[in-house]
Amino acid sequence: EVDLVRKKLKWKYKPFEVPKEILSEWRKIGEQGIVQEKKWNAVFNKKSKKIKDEFLRIISNKLPNDFNKLLEVQKKKFFDLKPDIASRQSSASIIEEITNSLPELIGGSADLSGSNNTKTKHSKILKPSNFSGNYIHYGVREHAMAGIMNGMALHGGIIPYGGTFLIFLDYCKPSLR
């Protein structure tokens, strides 16, 4: 098959050989990246120590120092009160508490926000006209939702969460593998 593709494309280069024209263009793009990185670093270095430290914490996938304490308080509250509520309501209560503490937390739901309680009072909708939000309305797209969350988690610096009902989980499975 490889030979047929080479023949069809009239590809005269050896395996793993990059044509000079392509290599030259690729290196130009790399040089642009170096310039952009220098600009970004100049802006970043002007930020306050607090902002820089918070950014570095987030991008290195570390939780805030007091985060476990916050979770312990929530667990104790549920253990002591033993509320008679649906699991999605107890989950919403926890999400409500941690959303304000973790700027790297981005939530969303596949058209079920009101039912599965994934949207909090701290949630701001992420949309094409405003990328500063922390909540995504995926629409009826469980497969896309799971794939997007996997991509965010893989990139790092973002902790995604989402919600759907168990009956719709089969739509997510290809993206969850």
Name each model feature, range by range:
Residues 1-141, 151:
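Conserved acidic/glycine
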